[in-house]
């Protein structure tokens, strides 16, 4: 199973992943950090290649971010049907995940707001993008768990 941790900076994704690995809930977890900083086109290529390889593995994988973060951070949210269709189209072309083999955990509560300073003027747009993306993922049959942070470690 691939567990994908998503959400704004400072919401506890990396801390959660570290605790999950230390807890030994999974016998052989693999941790993958996926940066949101590269260009969108480079990130799409890297994502498609990464997922192709990870899909061959037969153990639990914990991903700290995914192509979802790249979409959320790179595009300015617009509340229109055209924008939603654009996002749907992007997901169709790059996601390459089987809903029965992936779980998205959406971290929503910001614990370290200093990490958001770099994006201060875009936080609402990024958050709105995440909400749209998670809704679309649910519609596609993915299990999306909303997580408030470290206190919700008992998900596993």
Swiss-Prot record:
It catalyses: dTMP + ATP = dTDP + ADP. Gene3D superfamilies: P-loop containing nucleotide triphosphate hydrolases. GO terms for molecular function: ATP binding; dTMP kinase activity. It comes from the Viruses. Disulfide bonds: none annotated. Pathway: Pyrimidine metabolism; dTTP biosynthesis. Keywords: ATP-binding, Kinase, Nucleotide biosynthesis, Nucleotide-binding, Transferase. One of its GO terms (biological process) is dTTP biosynthetic process. Its EC number is 2.7.4.9. ATP binds at residues 7-14. Catalyzes the conversion of dTMP to dTDP. Belongs to the thymidylate kinase family. This is Putative thymidylate kinase. It comes from Acidianus bottle-shaped virus (isolate Italy/Pozzuoli). The lineage of its organism: Viruses, Viruses incertae sedis, Ampullaviridae, Bottigliavirus, Bottigliavirus ABV.
